């Protein structure tokens, strides 16, 4: 997320953090570099001008130079102003109304609006325990109705049927009546997208808005369109009262111009980030956490939240009890660990949220391939129950059969078994001898046995 901007800013700010005193002369070059980094990230010019002016004013203030580490204070100022540009605090959905709370979704074609409806429905059902109904009022694209129906089934929410022959306003009214009748907590209405903001589109959505009187009107924009995303949202907001923005395709946006421009140009908060194609890939937008990630400081809070949501407490407790009793760590246990890792978005997703992840060498980053976990799981799935319980019996012919069944090579099976053997030994060391032995075990595991994770052993040496 925002790799180019993050790399450029981290490199620029590293040069000033050691300064003993900040003067107009020694911050001039740094501010010029920051300005260039923001413009290259496609941040809107008025936003860049205001940002630079505020950073300069604060950096030359008396309090900063009274500090023992003015360079570090400068970094804090940049972080604070980044947060302010994006909205300072997380603004969650407002559902404080007589149920059903209606959420109207709008956006241009191809921005990921319908997918965002499915993600939002899943988010509300799983994290807020809401009974959700979704409906498509997009009568211009038959595939949109079918797409939303399929999404609704996959995320476990109800779908209100609609047809291309119906009027969008009639669809909206019927869905609202049904939501009231069946005591739904939330109704999410998907509307038609267009290639650009036009009068016909605005008139239609105004009518739908008037019929529903939604408590939330969210505009979905593609992060990769940069400041154009902010300008489109502004034009839309002038015709319809938006309450917030969902920024999609953030995982593919290396620049970050949209995230830094939207709040100041539209006056509306970013409420969610779409960070992938999967239905769980929707994150509440926290300006402070995003600013921290942009500056290479990681996002530990989000990582902890991911862990709390993804880890099955019951399974974790069983594993802990098994470990205490001294039972063997089996290949089935290993597979469970791989599944938990996948649920959290994979190793790379976790690494990106750790402080200092930006300083990892490209060699290490290239070694972390999340497809590797899929391959490892497939190999274990191709084993019989007996083989999983007794990996020592897996010799030549069995290894060839497992490789064939999992669509992998024999050397992949060999690597996995070697890695598993080292994990077993590490578990035994942990039972016998505490943290020092555990760290040495982990170093050995990550240094050689993990195949694709080879270079990560260096993390424990720094």
Swiss-Prot record:
GO biological process, one term: SRP-dependent cotranslational protein targeting to membrane
Keyword Ribonucleoprotein among UniProt keywords: yes
Keywords, in A-Z order: Cytoplasm, GTP-binding, Hydrolase, Nucleotide-binding, Ribonucleoprotein, RNA-binding, Signal recognition particle
Reactions this protein catalyses: GTP + H2O = GDP + phosphate + H(+)
Domain remark in the UniProt entry: Composed of three domains: the N-terminal N domain, which is responsible for interactions with the ribosome, the central G domain, which binds GTP, and the C-terminal M domain, which binds the RNA and the signal sequence of the RNC.
Subunit structure of this chain's protein: Part of the signal recognition particle protein translocation system, which is composed of SRP and FtsY. SRP is a ribonucleoprotein composed of Ffh and a 4.5S RNA molecule.
Function: Involved in targeting and insertion of nascent membrane proteins into the cytoplasmic membrane. Binds to the hydrophobic signal sequence of the ribosome-nascent chain (RNC) as it emerges from the ribosomes. The SRP-RNC complex is then targeted to the cytoplasmic membrane where it interacts with the SRP receptor FtsY. Interaction with FtsY leads to the transfer of the RNC complex to the Sec translocase for insertion into the membrane, the hydrolysis of GTP by both Ffh and FtsY, and the dissociation of the SRP-FtsY complex into the individual components.
Database matches in HAMAP family: SRP54
Protein name: Signal recognition particle protein
Organism annotation: Haemophilus influenzae (strain ATCC 51907 / DSM 11121 / KW20 / Rd)
Gene that this sequence comes from: ffh
């Amino acid at each position: 997320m925002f790799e180019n901007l993050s790399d450029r800013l981290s490199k620029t700010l590293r040069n000033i953090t050691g300064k003993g005193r900040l003067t107009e002369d020694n911050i001039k070059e740094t501010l010029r570099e920051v300005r260039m980094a923001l413009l290259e990230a496609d941040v809107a010019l008025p936003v860049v001008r205001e940002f630079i002016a505020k950073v300069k004013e604060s950096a030359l203030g008396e309090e900063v130079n009274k500090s023992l580490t003015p360079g570090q204070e400068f970094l804090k100022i940049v972080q604070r102003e980044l947060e302010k540009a994006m909205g300072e605090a997380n603004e969650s959905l407002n559902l404080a109304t007589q149920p059903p709370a209606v959420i109207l979704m709008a956006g241009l074609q191809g921005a990921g609006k319908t997918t965002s409806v499915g993600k939002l429905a899943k988010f509300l059902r799983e994290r807020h325990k809401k009974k959700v109904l979704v409906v498509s009022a997009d009568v211009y694209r038959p595939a949109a109705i079918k797409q939303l129906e399929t999404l609704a089934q996959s995320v476990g929410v109800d779908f209100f049927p609609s047809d291309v022959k119906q009027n969008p306003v009639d669809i909206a009214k019927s869905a609202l009546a049904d939501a009231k009748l069946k005591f739904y907590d939330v109704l999410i209405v998907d509307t038609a997208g267009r290639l650009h903001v036009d009068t016909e589109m605005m008139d239609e959505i105004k009518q739908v808005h008037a019929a529903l009187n939604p408590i939330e009107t969210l505009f979905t924009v593609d992060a990769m369109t940069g400041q154009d995303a902010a300008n489109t949202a502004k034009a839309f907001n002038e015709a319809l009262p938006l309450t917030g923005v969902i920024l999609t395709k953030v995982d593919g946006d290396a620049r970050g111009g949209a995230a830094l421009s939207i709040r100041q140009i539209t006056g509306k908060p970013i409420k969610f980030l779409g960070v992938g194609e999967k239905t769980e890939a929707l994150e509440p937008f926290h300006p402070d956490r995003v600013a921290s990630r942009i500056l290479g400081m990681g996002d530990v809070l989000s990582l902890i939240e991911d862990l709390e949501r993804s880890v099955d407490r019951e399974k974790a407790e069983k594993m802990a009890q098994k470990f205490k009793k001294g039972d063997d760590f089996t290949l089935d246990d290993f597979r469970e660990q791989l599944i938990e890792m996948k649920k959290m978005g994979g190793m790379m997703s976790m690494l990106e949220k750790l402080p200092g992840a930006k300083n990892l060498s490209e060699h290490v980053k290239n070694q972390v391939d999340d497809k590797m976990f899929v391959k490892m799981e497939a190999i274990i799935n191709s084993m019989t129950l007996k083989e999983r319980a007794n990996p020592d019996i897996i010799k030549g012919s069995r290894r060839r059969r497992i490789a064939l069944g999992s669509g992998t090579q024999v050397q992949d099976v060999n690597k996995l078994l070697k890695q598993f053997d080292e994990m077993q030994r590490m578990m035994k060391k942990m039972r016998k001898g505490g943290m020092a032995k555990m760290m040495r075990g982990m170093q050995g595991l990550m240094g050689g046995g993990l195949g694709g994770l080879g270079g990560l052993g260096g993390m424990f040496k720094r």
